[in-house]
Amino acid sequence: HARIFLKKILTGYSENYMELRSPCGAGIGQMAYYYDGNIYTCDEGRMVAEMGDQMFHLGNVNYSTYDDLMENRVCKVTCQASVLESLPGCCDCVYHPYCGVCPVISYASDNSIYARESNVYRCKIYKGILDILFEILFEEPDAEDILKTWI
C-alpha cells in the first residue's frame, strides 16, 4: 500500500486500486464472476456469498444484462457506502484524498456496509502508513527523490 499512497502523494495520480478509491470499485470498477454464473460486486462480495450470505449478489450471466447490473440496488448502495466525503470520520480526515473504504469488509466485520469511524483496523493501518510517509517526506531532505524510485 505504501507505493500506492506514494504515487498519489507525489504525482497526484492513482493506481486505481479498487479499495483505495472513493467510491470503491465494487460493481463499477470490478465485478466477480463465479463458476455458476453468479455475478458479485467484487471478489470480496463473492467470498461473503461463499459463507452463505448473498448480500453482494448482482445477477447472473445467464439472465442479467450490463444495465441490470448497473441498476441493481446492491451496486448503487455499495457505491454510495464507499464515498468518503459522506462517511463520518472519513469526510474530515486529512488523509481522505489518499484513502478508501471497502463496504464488503465493513459488512463482514461489523454487519454494516458503512465503515465505523477511526477505530477500524484498516483505517488505523492506513493512517499509520501515511503518518510515516509524510513524516519521512517532511523530515528527510533527500527522501522524495529516493521514494520516487518506488513509483
Language-model region placement:
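Radical SAM enzyme core and accessory elements
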Residues: 36, 47-50, 56, 61, ...
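Generic structural signal for secondary-structure transition and capping sites
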Residues: 29, 42, 74-75, 98
